[in-house]
């Protein structure tokens, strides 16, 4: 079979750390394993445009593997072109770069799987870190020191505690709930969540969280909002100028879910105006982010309020070890035709939805 892996280039960093599996050089640790089985293996970072390596190899690819950190956008046009395609694997969590609805509607016998749970702890930790970086005004403080400065007042005037704040999550699934668990130790005033379904009574009581059914009511009550929901048709552009009007003035917003859940220009404008005191996260649209992306340069009135990073929250080394092994497990099941996948990994099975996170059969 022809297996195409779309990963990012790491250069010398791949030699520095052999467990940097998400790069072309280390190829999820499975290139030799695949080739020894006789598969035709293509590993590339070149994924955009008609002349890309991905485009040139998609017509006869049986399997395409990508990551959320350097996503291969599998569009309707590419699906139509990929006549032999049977399996799409996401080495990580998040299949929104694939046109899942089109696969479902087309009747194609294509399965989509991801390595569920491989980076939930990694992302949850990054969420809490980003909150602290924003609320404590860490980035300007660090930049001040690097540049040789020392002005405590300049930093302290825009620095606060997390304790005593109302913190809300949009999405309380595997990642969102782990964020709530970690926030308990900070003694917030209240923890809120917005989701299509309630947590169990036991889960709610464990973290002391309260469900809010209306998203506008949720953001109006929160000092800090964190986005932890999947990207799908219903969540794309969810955080826009209209919703931002309902945020408590001067709130902080953290997004490690997907960049397209927020309208980039609207968020940048809200930070500039002071409606948001700051925005931080690691997800962008598209990825890699263009040099003129508004989130690269956005700032509040103090020149602060920006805690953006490249998309790496779920790509720390521990997570890469987990999603590399999970990808190999999926491939073993596929190649041996056992198809005994972990149920939680299946997004589409033979073109049919097996999860409520992204859509429903058409």
Swiss-Prot record:
ATP-binding is among the record's keywords: no
Keyword field? Cytoplasm, NAD, Oxidoreductase
Instruction: Give the binding site residues for substrate.
Output: 93, 119
Q: Where in the cell is it found?
A: Cytoplasm
Q: Which reaction does it catalyse?
A: formate + NAD(+) = CO2 + NADH
- Can you supply one Gene Ontology CC term for this chain's record? cytosol
Task: Give me the residues that bind NAD(+), please.
Answer: 174-175, 195, 230-234, 256, 282, 311-314, 357
Q: What is its EC number?
A: 1.17.1.9
Q: Which GO terms describe its biological process?
A: formate catabolic process
**GO MF, any single term:** NAD binding
Q: Function of this protein?
A: Catalyzes the NAD(+)-dependent oxidation of formate to carbon dioxide. Formate oxidation is the final step in the methanol oxidation pathway in methylotrophic microorganisms. Has a role in the detoxification of exogenous formate in non-methylotrophic organisms.
Q: Which family does it belong to?
A: Belongs to the D-isomer specific 2-hydroxyacid dehydrogenase family. FDH subfamily.
Quaternary structure, per UniProt, is: Homodimer.
Q: What is this protein called?
A: Formate dehydrogenase
User: Source species, please?
Assistant: Pichia angusta
Q: What is the lineage of its organism?
A: Eukaryota, Fungi, Dikarya, Ascomycota, Saccharomycotina
């Amino acid at each position: 079979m022809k297996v195409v892996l779309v990963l990012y280039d790491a250069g010398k960093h791949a030699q520095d750390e052999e467990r940097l599996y998400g790069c072309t050089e280390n190829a999820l640790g499975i290139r030799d394993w695949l080739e020894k089985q006789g598969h035709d293996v293509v590993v590339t970072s070149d994924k955009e445009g008609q002349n890309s390596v991905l485009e040139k190899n998609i017509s006869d690819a049986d399997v395409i593997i990508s990551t959320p950190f350097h996503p291969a956008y599998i569009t309707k046009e590419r699906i139509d072109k990929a006549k032999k395609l049977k399996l799409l694997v996401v080495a990580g969590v998040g299949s929104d770069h694939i046109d899942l609805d089109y696969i479902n509607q087309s009747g194609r016998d294509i399965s989509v799987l991801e390595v569920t749970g491989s980076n939930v702890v990694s992302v949850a930790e990054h969420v809490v870190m980003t909150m602290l970086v924003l609320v404590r005004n860490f980035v300007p403080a660090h930049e001040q020191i690097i540049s040789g400065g020392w002005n405590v007042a300049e930093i302290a005037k825009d620095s606060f505690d997390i304790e005593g704040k109302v913190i809300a999550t949009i999405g309380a699934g595997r990642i969102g709930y782990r964020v709530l668990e970690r926030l308990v130790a900070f003694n917030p005033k209240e923890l809120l969540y917005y989701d299509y379904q309630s947590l169990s009574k036991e889960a709610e009581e464990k973290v002391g969280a309260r469900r809010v059914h209306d998203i506008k009511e949720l953001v109006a009550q929160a000092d800090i909002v964190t986005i932890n929901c999947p990207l799908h048709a219903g969540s794309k552009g969810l955080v826009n100028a209209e919703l931002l009007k309902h945020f408590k003035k001067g709130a902080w917003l953290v997004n490690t879910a997907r960049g397209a859940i927020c309208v980039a220009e609207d968020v940048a404008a809200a930070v500039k105006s002071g409606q948001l005191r700051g925005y931080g996260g690691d997800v962008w649209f598209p990825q890699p982010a263009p040099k003129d992306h508004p989130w690269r340069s956005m700032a509040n009135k103090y020149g602060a309020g920006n805690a953006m990073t490249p998309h790496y929250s779920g790509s720390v080394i521990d997570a890469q070890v987990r999603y590399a092994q999970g990808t190999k497990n999926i491939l073993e099941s596929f190649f041996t035709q056992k198809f005994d996948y972990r149920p939680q990994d299946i997004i589409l099975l033979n073109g049919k939805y097996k999860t409520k996170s992204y859509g429903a059969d058409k």
